[in-house]
Amino acid sequence: MKTTTKILFFILLAGAVAAATLFLVAADNNKPFLPGVTVTDEHPNGCVDCHKVSGGDDYRLNAELANVEGHPKIDAIVKNVPQDCLMCHKVGANAGPLSVVAHRDHYRNPNDNHFVSSYQGACLNCHSVNPGSGKMTVKNGPKNW
């Protein structure tokens, strides 16, 4: 009888471990996509981690902005992105505040928008949050050109 009890105990223990594992895997698959909070932050430098040369195409900001009519060349004046963009894109500036320009460009036409389709349109690709304090900041990184 003791052997039967031990076998039954180990079968129940194995079943409990399997059930707990399945529960944790299911819970993990349902967690929200929050880079730096619930998943690894693949873009700690914000803009420059996404706007880069990829698949033979140049998505770096200096290349993309060269196609914007009237936009000055940024190659020499910008060292850190997006911090240095605030030289021209501050609140009240004729160029428009960076917050409006960036959000408009990243969220317009969501059905045909690379940021939405490839990066889940997640705020935390560009922003970081301190979960303890709730303080939100804009990620910044050295230019990549």
Q: Which ranges hold each PLM region?
A:
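Short sequence/structural segments immediately N-terminal
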Residues: 4-9, 17-145
